Amino acid sequence: MSDEESIKTRLKLRPVAIDTYRENVAYLHRECSVYRAEGFQALAKIRVGCNGKQIEAVLNVVDDVCIVAPDELGLSEQAFQRFGEPAGQLVNVAQAEPPLSMDGVRRKIGGERLDYGDYQAITSDIAKGRYSKMEMAAFLVATGQNGLDRDEVLSLTRAMLETGVRLSWNEPLVADKHCIGGIPGNRTSLLIVPIVAAHGMLIPKTSSRAITSPAGTADTMEVLARTDLAPESLDRLVRMERGCLAWGGTTRLAPVDDMLISVERPLGIDSQGQMVASILSKKLAAGATHLLLDIPVGPTAKVRQMRDAMSLRKLFEYVGDRVGLHLEAVITDGAQPVGRGIGPVLEVRDVMQVLENDPEAPVDLREKSLRLAGRILEFDPDVRGGFGYSIARDILESGRALAKMHRIIDAQGRQERRLEPGRLVFEVRAERAGVVVGIDNFFLAQTARLAGAPMSRGAGVDLLNKLGDTVEEGQPLYRVYAEFPANFEFAREFTRTRSGYNIGDAAFLTKTHMEF
């Protein structure tokens, strides 16, 4: 007899209008006979089943019949959609067995090395919704605290890749680009994709939303167009326009990655091994054959020393080579934000200025994007080495990149409402006269997040001065935009005693790294 058949009391299914993001949550009334008979506890995992379907969910116990009655079982919005049964359907409820793969997590917490089978079991259970957020957090902390050797990273990459669909473009060269993050602004992908696509090379760019930054590529692109594209729409769009700027979450590309990101984001976790596996599994799932990786180095970047950048590059190359991906990694300047805007709307302004060849466009964003695009164009066997930059520049200056960007925007679904920077604004001013010799990337990113970015699209930071600029006492260094009073006050309080700028003598100017 199955567990479902052994339970005599069945409950009526009820959707509960609560957004629990990617976690399945179930709701039982405290006076429910099943709750009392089974000895359930709040936050325990339960299994809900009927008609051969099953779903596991974290249990929440309620006392209000307006949420669920004693004869009902409630499921959060996401869980109800995944379960796929109508409201009022009779369902059975049972204790869920803990996932067997948690043994691997416990062994990793103890410092053991895991093999491919362990990671395959863990990622499979996560993909099936058998891990709660607490269990996923335990896995992330274990792999972050105790680290992953390069073969473990390879195993995790392959395991994550197997949990979702893998796109195939049936072309010998499918390009992609990725930055490991940590640098505010830096919205080069929104320039590289139209340049490369205008050249005719396939570049289906799928991106995550922000994890610990004020905006990810998908967050910024959503100011201009839809990014939540179904796989069939994505396929049609890319074949027509040769490129896209889409969110990877709706295409089920390595879905475990998105589930882990939902836990990484609030915890601020972004460990090296997880990062490599996350990036490469997503790129392989998107069908990439050639990848250009941007590793910024700077005193307040994710990677702060050149030796660490070289080590990370070797790890990417090791894993990339063994999964059949042609990968080139370049080390770039991470001493300060790239562009002037930090936050979705402000970053879009910078991007469009570059595409429109506006003389006010940020020079650093334009130059970095052209250099990276040039390296990607040199993947093309018909482009001679060293000529990629000039080809990319010609595509930009001729207006072909702008035209291609507008076609991509229209194909993805142009946003009807024009978004503007937040209406609540304050300026952060220099406390002394001198030269800007250092800028704290993390501080400015945190300021933008406190102001509401990326959830509030118009929130963020607009830089008025960069490294090497001479400023006077009391001169504005940057403006902070917010859409809601609470965010405005959070950001203003955060910047009340610090600016994130180091102002001093030009002799102490932060050294930069650039490798092209």
Swiss-Prot record:
Catalytic activity, EC: 2.4.2.4
The reactions it catalyses are: thymidine + phosphate = 2-deoxy-alpha-D-ribose 1-phosphate + thymine
What molecular functions are annotated in GO for this chain?
1,4-alpha-oligoglucan phosphorylase activity; thymidine phosphorylase activity
Source superkingdom: Bacteria
PROSITE patterns in the cross-refs: THYMID_PHOSPHORYLASE
Stored SMART domains: PYNP_C
GO BP: pyrimidine nucleobase metabolic process; pyrimidine nucleoside metabolic process
List the GO cellular component terms: cytosol
- Protein family: Belongs to the thymidine/pyrimidine-nucleoside phosphorylase family. Type 2 subfamily.
Classification via HAMAP family: Thymid_phosp_2 (MF_00703)
Instruction: Supply the name of the protein.
Output: Putative thymidine phosphorylase
Q: Which organism is it from?
A: Methylococcus capsulatus (strain ATCC 33009 / NCIMB 11132 / Bath)
